[in-house]
Amino acid sequence: LLRLIDLLCEGPNRLFGIVGKGRLVVGYDADVTLVDLAASREITDDWVAAKCGWTPFAGMTVTGWPVGTIIRGRSVMRDGQLMNEPSGQVMRFYEGAGP
């Protein structure tokens, strides 16, 4: 789990220098996905919320399923249901960060 956190959260922040992302500490955005590690589900296109409406992973069965998402401290998904309209924000980067 610690390796996964590094790959998905801390690593991109180190690599790209994204301001306020990658950690759960005071002053950072509270971006969290809650995952039920015991849940097993088949991925289907009808679950995809992206504009394209499909995924190349359709038909695959996976163990571990997102059950909630919090973005900037606001709950946006619970039990597979989107709770609010999308509300994107411009991302900021530390000067001189990146590859």
Model-derived features: where do they sit?
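Active-site microenvironment of metallo-dependent hydrolases
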Residues: 1-99
